[in-house]
Amino acid sequence: MLQPTEIERLLVVMAHPDDVDFGSAGTVATLTGAGVKVTYCLVTDGNAGGSDRTVSRADVAALRREEQTAAASVVGVTDLVFLGHPDGRVVADLVLRCDISRVIRQVRPQVVMCQSPERNLDRIFASHPDHLAAGNAAVSAVYPDSRNPFAFPELLEEGLEPWEVNEIWLSAHPVSSDFVDVTEHIDRKFQALRCHVSQLPDPDGMEQRFRTFMSANAVTAGFDEGTFVEGFRVVQAS
């Protein structure tokens, strides 16, 4: 796993607003605090989120974009891209792969952080079908698409040269290979999560559950008790 001093730019690709904050906001805060430029790429606007049928889906999408932008600022991220694919219907097709490849070539990151394309049966809520599809498309965009000059020639016509990503960090993978100690930034993680007001009917309960989960993972991974970690399956891509 590359260290913050070895990373200049990192691209986060997630299916929905709030996904990065649940899984990785502590890591993002750690990286931005070390001077890494982080960009968020959200595949959908999250317009299928929530259960209030009196609110239009367009209004939900606008609200969730605002919530994600606010949450991003808490952890030092100001560069966000919303791809606008339909929430609940994400498909890892060539259209999405091209869209993500475009962002990779624009950002030119050393690391792409995305959701695991493999279902985690121990954490089924982290394996929403949109998450799996977004992860699948992001991994395919890293290899082979974004580095291949003959994949999506329209990107060359846009002036976007191929780019080779060094590592992929998969969140919510069934098996984590590496862990980031986010204890110093744990409060900022939950401050970011609390920006997603429309999705959190019980923010206090959510925070307690995640603190318990993250501290238990830390002990299992060999960290001192009282430490909080976020886990990733790191894939070498170059």
Where are these regions (language model features)?
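Metal-dependent de-N-acetylase/amidase catalytic core
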Residues: 1-11, 93-238
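Active-site rim/loop-helix segments in enzyme catalytic domains that contact anionic ligands
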Residues: 1-108, 233
